[in-house]
């Protein structure tokens, strides 16, 4: 690229539209798929699906010391859980190292790169000099304009970056951002052992994969200018850039583990969120469509664009995520929820659920899910259905039983025993409980609380009529009989 270039804007090539759109998600497998990465993947996926284009997945595993198979599995598992399907085969960057080196040598032959023989000591001296002058350290290699080095001697390949003029990126999120070429350095393309650097690999892979839109976190904005210098040196098509602000914690600081910067698997397993809730929340975390909060997948694909991605960092709010999850729990299919909740219940009650148990759990969902915010809350609320005999009673429930009016549970049990299996229905159960409350001259709540404690061992449960119906006549009467033997003041 000619050094006398004036300022150039990085949208010289027409922006791809429709089926020509190609986006990519390119995580490094050095850890889990964190929540910020999941949002980046979602935005790329939605943009591609909105345009009817392609969404590609590339695993940037060039850091061999830190890349692990477990991390790769976690990333792929997280993507599948979020239902962010990708087109074609997964690309593994390390396997393409020969192609990356080929481009570097091609650039060397064309004069766009040069061999640099600076030693580590020389680089350290240059760095110390920059620090002493309180200047940013940028490599200005004396080998840029020399060709008398020995190709057999240890060296790196550096990009011959432009030194004059400026570059402006017309970023779809950040707007126009300009950097003087003098602020850029001749970064390394190939290390002394011949391995390619991240900066080279990313540019080559994006070009070869046909990526038209690079949508990523704004912590990569500075890299874009260096990558653009390489793209122009190769005379390749320039992608459209969209650098999305990072997610911050509720206190406005960079998102960390204490804020919720956990792996996607933690939101699924430990916290019990549904993928549609996480997707909806991440979509609204930095992008908006008027006042719409609940956005279906079909609506998200139809509405998503880059014009409505905000420039300011979004703040992660667990309460909003929980509220969204509660909505999606209420909307979810009961059999699906039962399948998701069953393993949690098995862990809580210490036994496997058989088919009859799972059928009961599905039947109970309508009563369990209205007030729940997570799968864990549903599981906790359902344990009374599968409690062992004798049923555990928590401290608060024991206090309720101990303070119940003498004879109240016995009278209630006797009245319920008068209902046979054919009359163990919601209507008849409600009538019986209300009749006993009236006979005891108590409000319904005063009777329902000890009844709930006796039947569930807890003070919080689904409605008492639902509890009686779900437990059935035999179990309900057995638990009521057992509860009458709790010692006073227990």
Curated annotation (Swiss-Prot):
Recorded name of the encoding gene: gltX1
Give the protein name, as stated in the record. Glutamate--tRNA ligase 1
The record lists the organism as Sphingopyxis alaskensis (strain DSM 13593 / LMG 18877 / RB2256)
Its cellular-component GO annotations read:
cytosol
GO terms classed as biological process:
glutamyl-tRNA aminoacylation
Subunit-structure text: Monomer.
Cellular localisation: Cytoplasm
E.C. number(s) listed in UniProt = 6.1.1.17
Q: Which UniProt keywords apply?
A: Aminoacyl-tRNA synthetase, ATP-binding, Cytoplasm, Ligase, Nucleotide-binding, Protein biosynthesis
NCBIfam families the record matches: gltX_bact (TIGR00464)
């Amino acid at each position: 690229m000619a050094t006398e270039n004036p300022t150039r804007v990085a949208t010289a090539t027409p922006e791809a539209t429709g089926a020509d759109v190609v986006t990519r998600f390119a995580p490094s497998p050095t850890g889990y798929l964190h929540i910020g990465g999941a949002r980046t993947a979602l935005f790329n996926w939605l943009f591609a699906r909105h345009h009817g284009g392609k969404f590609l997945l590339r695993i940037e595993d060039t850091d061999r010391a830190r890349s692990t198979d477990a991390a790769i599995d976690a990333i792929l598992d997280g993507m599948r859980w979020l239902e962010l399907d990708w087109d074609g085969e997964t690309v593994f960057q390390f396997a393409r190292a020969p192609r990356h080196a080929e481009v570097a040598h091609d650039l060397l032959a064309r004069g766009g790169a040069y061999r640099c023989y600076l030693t580590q000591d020389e680089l350290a001296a240059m760095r110390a000099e920059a620090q002493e002058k309180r200047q940013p350290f940028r490599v200005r290699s004396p080998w840029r304009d020399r060709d008398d080095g020995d190709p057999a001697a240890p060296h790196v390949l550096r990009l011959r970056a432009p030194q004059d003029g400026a570059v402006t990126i017309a970023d779809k999120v950040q707007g126009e951002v300009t950097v003087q070429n003098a602020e850029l350095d001749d970064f390394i393309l190939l290390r002394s052992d011949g391995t390619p650097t991240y900066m080279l690999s990313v540019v080559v892979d994006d070009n070869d994969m046909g990526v038209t839109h690079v949508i990523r976190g704004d912590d990569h904005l500075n890299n874009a200018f260096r990558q653009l210098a390489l793209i122009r040196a190769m005379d390749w098509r320039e992608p459209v850039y969209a650098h999305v602000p990072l997610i911050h914690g509720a206190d406005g600081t960079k998102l960390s583990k204490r804020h919720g910067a956990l792996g996607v698997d933690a939101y699924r397993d430990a916290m019990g969120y549904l993928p549609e809730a996480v997707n909806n929340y991440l979509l609204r975390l930095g992008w908006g469509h008027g006042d719409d909060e609940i956005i279906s997948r079909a609506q998200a694909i139809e509405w998503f664009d880059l014009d409505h991605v905000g420039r300011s960092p979004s703040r992660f709010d667990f309460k909003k995520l929980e509220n969204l999850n509660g909505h999606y729990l209420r909307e979810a299919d009961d059999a699906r929820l039962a399948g998701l909740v069953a393993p949690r219940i098995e862990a809580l009650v210490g036994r496997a659920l058989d088919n009859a148990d799972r059928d009961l759990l599905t039947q109970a969902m309508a009563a369990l899910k209205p007030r729940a915010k997570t799968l864990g809350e549903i599981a906790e609320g359902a344990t009374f259905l599968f409690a062992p005999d004798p049923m555990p009673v928590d401290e608060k429930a024991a206090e309720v039983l101990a303070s119940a009016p003498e004879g109240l549970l016995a009278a209630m049990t006797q009245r319920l025993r008068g209902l046979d299996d054919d009359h163990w229905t919601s209507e008849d159960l409600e009538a019986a409980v209300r009749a006993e409350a009236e006979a005891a001259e108590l409000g319904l709540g005063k009777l329902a609380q000890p009844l709930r404690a006796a039947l569930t061992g807890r003070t919080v449960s689904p409605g008492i009529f639902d509890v009686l119906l779900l437990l059935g006549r035999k179990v309900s009467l057995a638990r009521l009989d057992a509860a009458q033997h709790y010692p006073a003041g227990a």
